[in-house]
């Protein structure tokens, strides 16, 4: 099974006894569920290989399957297998070494998405590998960027055959659900049978991940993804205008919902996407070089991957625009061929020529630099010492410093002009106008790198670089400045110095980056508590030709709840917010200035106001890319003031001043100043702007508090593996008019980052709200995400009653959360529900003898029974719910239901052992769902008996039984006491088939006898059941008192004779009794088997006589 193409001729000898003596393990490349992979050197030849160390355990069969598949594969597009050896309890698998790891690792390490040329290379190589596998009747079943490895030459190869499958001629389709959830094809999830077209679907999803950094539905819980893939339309690129039509068409073909409509790997290799975009393996060079630099700075691949994972977790739930890799320059060639292998051969010659040219250029440059240094040494004349001329010496020093600084600035400016600016990376244009993007820090100014909102993370220490030619920053110990001059030189040389990320833990990750410069605070010259206008002389001198008019200024404070911090936390909405009205196109400068005693990191958000005539005067409660004004740098600086200049179109906007950390109290001033710039023939004027604080009297009606999922209230979700979600905290929300409502669920620091959260909104009955928590009443729901908050906006929400149920996805995930509701309905109300008076809940389980099954089985009497008593003097509506708590070991839920029977007396204190159709009020269906319920009207002073049951005996499961009513404290529920029980088996055979009692025959005395003693008397029930058969014999029994020698004395009781499955007799006795039970057939000589069961209120003796 070999493929033409150049393969490595490296081979290992057979019979290596101790692989640890033959291979040197250099570094760990990664760790997985089956083992670890190391970079290693084969000592005898020096060849670099990859060694996978796998423990020999119960999962080792899967590894043997992977080895078997790798042994059979001989293709340059599949990672080569060299051999495997055993040492102690570990298997050493020797494989081809791919220097740059997986495509996924390269993306995570560099924090970059791939460009189209790179995606084309990966997809083409993957299709070549799949064509080889599919031609040999193999399915990979786990195609994803994490299983596509990149060699040092930029070649891409398929790896990880742990879940691959072999297709035989007899089974051309498989039915096993296996693989990574986000990449599974619809037919794999639906288990309708699939073939190698499932790999094509996974390749389409992989292409989207390489373009957008995440696969579709990445922010949803994996179980939710398994539902979305078969039922939703095929995924597409989020921003198709950024990509070529050929790329979009390639993805559409790969993601055809019907597997029969997906092209084969062979057909896709001919797609026009590769004709236009496939260049050569050299296109991976920029990405691999950047990855290698990061790996070296981190101290190894494993550390680099850990740092990338930590950065990725901090970005979870935050919208980020990831940097694209550099575009690929078209090679100069008139005879360029269009296939990968031929391109690589042609380019190898070009690369060698370029290396020789670079070496010559470097040699020439070194010679020129040496000559220049010699000339400078000859020209330099040291000044003669003159102790009497101090002024001249000082002036000379200043002149030399000015010259040095000027040269540094010119050099830095020239360097900056040759590298692409951050604005060229992002596709987000400034829709509101022109932005200068400069920040004032104190009385000086540093020119900001001005990222668009989607790229704001590039300034944080755990984020991606601001330019495609730079390497992501790796946290290191900062160099200590030798003097204040060093600080000044560093700031002058680095135009973005004012926006560098701080190295402290406070600045990592999140929506908002944080800067590091600390500037000296000037003495505040003004204090104001109202909107004022000051003279332009109090403003810092502008560094542009624009002339600033008098500012519109407001003063405010961050105090208590209003010190909400930046948007990295859920508390930012509590900061002061200001409405800015602009009536004509105007160039403005927004300045935020600290006036308190303590200097902290500050910044502000500038966003469009809410839509709608009424809502635009209210606070902004969502800060996403679509609402923020593009072009403004929102880096937080430890500075006296921060400012930005921008040209804005007429409209309403919101400014939100904030400190970086919450609970940092202090005062501030916010200035909005119009410049005198000429725009469209008209000059700016302060009359064009109006600034005012958004006050509570015109704001949203806000209800907010902190709550917990704890103990039984950590019940999980409706979509998860538990029905206990109904025990979560619940909130009743009532609106009296159609309203716009936004609900924000935020998780606090005691909840792990990986925990998914979300909430449901149910339409509710105000009088009996709990019964509304069913799928039929579900009004809306959110996705479950593992970010810091979930925001849901419901436009035009009809008046009525609703219940909000916040959830973690899985049960028993404890922690604190906040729930905040913003509504423009001024007459509404929201409060936490306490339904303890309306809901009676008992916990039970079917376990051992108490898992007796339904009424089809005589053992139903072993089930627990519950008495519900209506103490009201009027009819009462009750809803009875039976809930299964959770799935066990990922198995399907059993079929369960319950019976509702009339109680013979209101205060019954014993279980029912006999039921007739007239006794049963009703029953539910038996279904394998989390909940079944039954609703009835109970008459005054009556009681029901509830019998929860599994459909078949022997099923053990926990459950909740709930009784819900719209009247408080009128229903009582209690479990009926269990009686002592014994069960024996017997048969009528030979002489023991004596028939019934008769005065004319004594044969009945030969029937089987069972000793039944009641030392204290009391109530008892005897049940005789015959074996299952198409038609039943007539059966019955007698209970006699006996003398000490066993002689029958007198009847205690006797049953009738019926031709049915069982006969039941309930009776009682006021004194202790010693006796026997004699089961009988109606006619003699009828052979059969039977069971005899006794239930007794008190202790009993029951055994074969």
UniProtKB/Swiss-Prot annotation:
The active site is at residue 142. Keywords: ATP-binding, Kinase, Manganese, Metal-binding, Nucleotide-binding, Repeat, Serine/threonine-protein kinase, Transferase. GO terms for cellular component: cytoplasm; nucleus. Residues 836-972 are annotated as: Domain III 3. One of its GO terms (biological process) is negative regulation of canonical Wnt signaling pathway. Residues 1076-1103 are annotated as: Domain III 4. Its EC number is 2.7.11.1. Residues 348-396, 411-482, 495-541 are annotated as: Disordered. It catalyses: L-seryl-[protein] + ATP = O-phospho-L-seryl-[protein] + ADP + H(+); L-threonyl-[protein] + ATP = O-phospho-L-threonyl-[protein] + ADP + H(+). Probable serine/threonine-protein kinase. This is Serine/threonine-protein kinase 4 homolog B. It comes from Dictyostelium discoideum. The gene is krsB.
């Amino acid at each position: 099974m070999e493929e033409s193409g150049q393969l490595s001729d490296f081979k290992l000898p057979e019979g290596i006894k101790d692989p640890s003596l033959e291979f040197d393990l250099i570094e760990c490349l990664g760790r997985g569920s089956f083992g670890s992979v190391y970079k290693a050197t084969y000592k005898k030849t020096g060849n670099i290989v990859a060694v996978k160390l796998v423990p020999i355990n119960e999962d080792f069969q899967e590894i043997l399957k992977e080895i078997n598949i790798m042994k059979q594969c001989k293709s340059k597009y599949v990672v080569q297998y060299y051999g495997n050896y055993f040492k102690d309890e570990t298997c050493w698998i020797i494989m081809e070494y791919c220097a740059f790891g997986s495509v996924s690792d390269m993306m995570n390490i560099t924090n970059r998405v791939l460009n189209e040329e790179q995606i084309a290379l990966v997809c083409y190589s993957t299709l070549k590998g799949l064509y080889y596998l599919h031609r040999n009747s193999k399915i990979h079943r786990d195609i994803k960027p994490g299983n596509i490895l990149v060699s040092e030459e930029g070649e891409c190869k398929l790896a990880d055959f742990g879940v691959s499958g072999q297709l035989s001629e007899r089974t051309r389709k498989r039915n096993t659900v296996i693989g990574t959830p986000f990449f599974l094809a619809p037919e794999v999830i639906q288990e309708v049978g699939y073939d190698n077209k499932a790999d094509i679907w996974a390749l389409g999803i992989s292409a989207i991940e390489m373009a957008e950094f995440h696969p579709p539905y990445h922010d949803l819980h994996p179980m939710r993804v398994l539902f979305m893939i078969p039922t939703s339309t095929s995924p597409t690129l989020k921003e198709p205008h950024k990509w070529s039509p050929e790329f979009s068409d390639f993805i559409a073909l790969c993601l055809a919902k019907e597997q029969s409509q997906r092209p084969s790997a062979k057909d896709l290799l001919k797609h026009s996407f590769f004709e236009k975009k496939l260049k050569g393996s050299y296109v991976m060079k920029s990405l691999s070089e950047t990855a290698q630099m990061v790996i070296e700075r981190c101290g190894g691949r494993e550390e680099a991957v850990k740092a990338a994972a930590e950065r990725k977790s901090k970005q979870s739930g935050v919208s980020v625009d990831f940097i694209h890799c550099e575009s690929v320059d078209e090679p100069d060639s008139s005879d360029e061929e269009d296939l990968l292998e031929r391109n690589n051969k042609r380019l190898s010659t070009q690369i060698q020529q370029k290396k020789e040219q670079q070496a010559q250029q470097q040699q020439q440059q070194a010679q020129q630099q040496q000559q220049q240094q010699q000339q400078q040494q000859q020209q330099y004349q040291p000044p003669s010492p003159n102790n009497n001329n101090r002024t001249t010496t000082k002036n000379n020093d200043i002149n030399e410093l000015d010259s040095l600084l000027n040269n540094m600035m010119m050099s830095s400016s020239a360097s900056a002009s040759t590298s692409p600016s951050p604005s060229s990376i992002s596709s987000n244009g400034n829709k509101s106008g022109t932005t200068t993007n400069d920040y004032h820090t104190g009385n000086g100014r540093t020119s900001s790198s001005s990222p668009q909102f989607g790229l704001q993370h590039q300034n944080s220490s755990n984020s991606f670089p601001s330019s495609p030619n730079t390497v992501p920053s790796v946290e290191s110990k900062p160099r200590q400045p030798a003097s204040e001059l060093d600080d000044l030189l560093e700031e002058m040389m680095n135009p973005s110095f004012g926006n560098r990320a701080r190295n402290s833990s406070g600045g990592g990750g999140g929506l908002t980056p944080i800067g590091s410069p600390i500037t000296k605070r000037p003495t505040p010259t003004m204090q104001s508590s109202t909107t004022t206008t000051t003279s332009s002389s109090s403003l810092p001198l502008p560094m542009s030709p624009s002339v600033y008019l008098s500012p519109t200024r407001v003063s405010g404070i961050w105090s208590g709840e209003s010190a909400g911090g930046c948007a990295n936390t859920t508390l930012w909405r509590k900061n002061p917010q200001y409405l800015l009205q602009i009536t004509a196109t105007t160039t403005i400068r927004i300045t935020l200035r600290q006036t308190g005693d303590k200097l902290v990191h500050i910044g502000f958000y500038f966003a469009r106001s809410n839509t709608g005539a009424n809502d635009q005067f209210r606070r902004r409660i969502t800060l996403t890319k679509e609402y923020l004004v593009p072009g403004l740098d929102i880096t937080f600086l430890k500075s006296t003031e921060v400012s930005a200049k921008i040209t804005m179109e007429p409209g309403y906007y919101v400014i939100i001043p904030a400190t970086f950390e919450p609970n940092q109290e202090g005062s501030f001033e916010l200035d909005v100043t119009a410049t005198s710039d000429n725009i469209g023939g008209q000059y700016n004027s302060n009359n064009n702007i109006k600034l005012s604080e958004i006050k509570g009297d015109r704001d949203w009606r806000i209800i907010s508090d902190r709550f917990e999922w704890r103990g039984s209230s950590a019940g999980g979700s409706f979509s998860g593996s538990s029905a206990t979600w109904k025990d979560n905290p619940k909130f009743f929300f009532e609106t009296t008019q159609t309203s716009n409502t936004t609900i924000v669920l935020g998780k606090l620091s005691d909840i792990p980052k990986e925990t998914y959260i979300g909430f449901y909104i149910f339409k509710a009955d105000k009088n009996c709200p709990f019964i509304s928590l069913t799928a039929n009443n579900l009004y809306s729901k959110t996705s479950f995400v593992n970010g810091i908050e979930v925001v849901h906006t419901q436009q035009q929400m009809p008046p009525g009653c609703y219940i909000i149920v916040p959830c973690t996805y899985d049960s028993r995930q404890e922690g604190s959360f906040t729930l905040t509701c913003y509504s423009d309905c001024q007459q509404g109300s929201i409060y936490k529900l306490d339904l303890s008076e309306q809901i009676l809940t008992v916990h039970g389980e079917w376990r051992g003898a108490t898992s007796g099954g339904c009424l089809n089985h005589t053992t139903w009497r072993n089930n627990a029974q519950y008495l519900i008593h209506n103490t009201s003097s009027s009819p009462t509506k009750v809803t009875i719910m039976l809930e299964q708590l959770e799935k066990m070991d990922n198995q399907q839920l059993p079929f369960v239901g319950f019976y509702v029977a009339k109680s013979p007396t209101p205060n019954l204190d014993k279980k029912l052992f006999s039921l007739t159709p007239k006794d049963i009020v009703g029953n539910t269906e038996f279904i394998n769902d989390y909940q079944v319920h039954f609703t009835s009207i109970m008459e005054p002073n009556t009681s029901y008996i509830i019998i929860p049951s599994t459909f078949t005996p022997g099923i053990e499961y926990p459950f909740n039984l709930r009784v819900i009513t719209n009247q408080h404290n009128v229903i009582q529920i209690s479990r009926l006491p269990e009686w002592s029980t014994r069960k024996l088996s017997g048969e009528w055979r030979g002489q023991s088939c004596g028939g019934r009692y008769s005065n004319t025959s004594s044969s009945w005395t030969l029937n089987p006898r069972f000793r039944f003693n009641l030392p204290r008397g009391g109530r008892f029930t005897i049940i005789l059941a015959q074996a299952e058969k198409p038609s039943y014999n007539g059966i019955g029994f007698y209970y006699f008192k006996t003398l000490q020698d066993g002689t029958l004395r007198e009847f205690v009781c006797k049953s009738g004779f019926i031709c049915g499955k069982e006969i039941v007799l309930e009776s009682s006795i006021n004194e202790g009794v010693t006796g026997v039970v004699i089961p009988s057939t109606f006619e003699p000589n009828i052979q059969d088997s039977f069971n005899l069961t006794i239930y007794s209120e008190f202790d009993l003796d029951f055994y074969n006589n």
